[in-house]
């Protein structure tokens, strides 16, 4: 089974009609941010913090839940976790918000680099809810486990898996396919574990991508072919498959991509990416099927490139 996938440049949205399917492409750029934290000094906690805590000792679940409110950041309402810094009046703010502030959000005083050691000690005995509790996570964690859990939490919101950065949607896994069908109607879905992904007009200049969905084994997979210019004047194609699901679910599958023609064969086999991981990092690290334009021409037919895609259970 095959369907033509027309290219779509990576610019806002432009879909062209194909033989029952269209592709999606947008101009992409990657930006990275960095932050730095200044040196901190240790000091005794202010009287306001320590007096609040002295009457709230204990470690049962109910008291732990009550104590978490003491760690709420007044700016983002996330939790302030060690290392905990306070202003000269004893007010707390989380590290993320602190880097964006010039004064204490509570008293407008200066942001001193003073460690609140008493609150840090209390934090080690308090269990915090996962930040994705609003999406259904019921985990209760000590602060040393919180960040690691949240990075892989099965309840954390999924980003739109479509290539490019134009779509800002995010939501629970069970709404991803609904989002794709409603907001990305140009993407066609083919049924079966063996299909042919036919990308049209591969000779178009610039950054272009082709996208198709494949449905089998009760799951949905997104097939992505991107053409990028990683180095000046050197264009490359990157082909990869991602599962609309978690990494744990992705471990149950393996995909195989194959270019075939003119007595030549080029193959790639790997575990599909999960949409939590996305495809950007894999493409950046060339952890996918990679070939340049000269190789593409060996397998292309009148500017169209067919890729055999096979999904298998492990």
From Swiss-Prot:
For this UniProt record, give its keywords in alphabetical order, as a comma-separated list.
Cytoplasm, Developmental protein, Metal-binding, Nucleus, Sensory transduction, Transferase, Ubl conjugation pathway, Vision, Zinc, Zinc-finger
- Annotated region (Disordered), positions in chain: 1-55
Q: Which InterPro entries match?
A: 7-in-absentia-prot_TRAF-dom, SINA-like_animal, Sina-like_RING, TRAF-like, Znf_RING, Znf_RING/FYVE/PHD, Znf_SIAH
- Signal peptide: which range, if any? none
Please list the residues that bind Zn(2+) 1.
Answer: 130, 137, 149, 153
Supply the CDD domains for this chain.
Sina
Q: In which tissues is it expressed?
A: In many ommatidial precursor cells.
Q: Which molecular function terms from Gene Ontology are attached?
A: identical protein binding; ubiquitin conjugating enzyme binding; ubiquitin protein ligase activity; ubiquitin-protein transferase activity; zinc ion binding
Its UniProt entry gives the catalysed reaction(s) as: S-ubiquitinyl-[E2 ubiquitin-conjugating enzyme]-L-cysteine + [acceptor protein]-L-lysine = [E2 ubiquitin-conjugating enzyme]-L-cysteine + N(6)-ubiquitinyl-[acceptor protein]-L-lysine
Positions annotated as zinc finger (SIAH-type)? 125-185
> Which Gene3D superfamilies does the record associate with it?
Apoptosis, Tumor Necrosis Factor Receptor Associated Protein 2, Chain A (2.60.210.10), Zinc/RING finger domain, C3HC4 (zinc finger) (3.30.40.10)
Instruction: Give the quaternary structure.
Output: Component of some E3 complex at least composed of sina, ebi and phyl. Interacts with eff.
Q: What is this protein called?
A: E3 ubiquitin-protein ligase sina
Q: Which organism is it from?
A: Drosophila melanogaster
Q: Which gene encodes it?
A: sina
């Amino acid at each position: 089974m095959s369907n033509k996938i027309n290219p779509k440049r990576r610019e806002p949205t432009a879909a062209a009609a194909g033989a029952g399917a269209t592709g999606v492409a947008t101009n992409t750029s990657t930006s990275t941010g960095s932050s730095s934290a200044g040196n901190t000094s240790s000091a005794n906690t202010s009287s306001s913090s320590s007096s609040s805590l002295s009457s709230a000792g204990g470690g049962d679940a109910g008291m732990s839940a009550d104590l978490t409110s003491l760690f709420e950041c007044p700016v983002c309402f996330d939790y302030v976790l060690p290392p905990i810094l306070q202003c000269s009046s004893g007010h707390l703010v989380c590290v993320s918000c602190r880097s964006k502030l010039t004064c204490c959000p509570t008293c407008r005083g200066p942001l001193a680099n003073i460690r609140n050691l008493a609150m840090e000690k209390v934090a080690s005995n308090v269990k915090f809810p996962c930040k994705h509790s609003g999406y259904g996570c019921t985990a209760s964690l000590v602060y040393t486990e919180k960040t690691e859990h949240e990075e892989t939490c099965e309840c954390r919101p999924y980003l739109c898996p479509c290539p490019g950065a134009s779509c800002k949607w995010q939501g629970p896994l069970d709404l991803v396919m609904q989002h794709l069908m409603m907001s990305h109607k140009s993407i066609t879905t083919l049924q079966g574990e063996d299909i042919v992904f036919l990308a049209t007009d591969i000779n178009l200049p610039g950054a272009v991508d082709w996208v198709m969905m494949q449905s089998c084994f009760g799951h949905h997979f997104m097939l992505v072919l991107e053409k990028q210019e990683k180095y000046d004047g050197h264009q490359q194609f990157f082909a990869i498959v991602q599962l609309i699901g978690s990494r744990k679910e992705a471990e149950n599958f393996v995909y195989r991509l194959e270019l075939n023609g003119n007595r030549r064969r080029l193959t790639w086999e790997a575990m599909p990416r999960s949409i939590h991981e996305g495809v950007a990092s894999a493409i950046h690290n060339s952890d996918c099927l990679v070939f340049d334009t000269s190789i593409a021409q060996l397998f292309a037919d009148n500017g169209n490139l067919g890729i055999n895609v096979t999904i298998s259970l492990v």
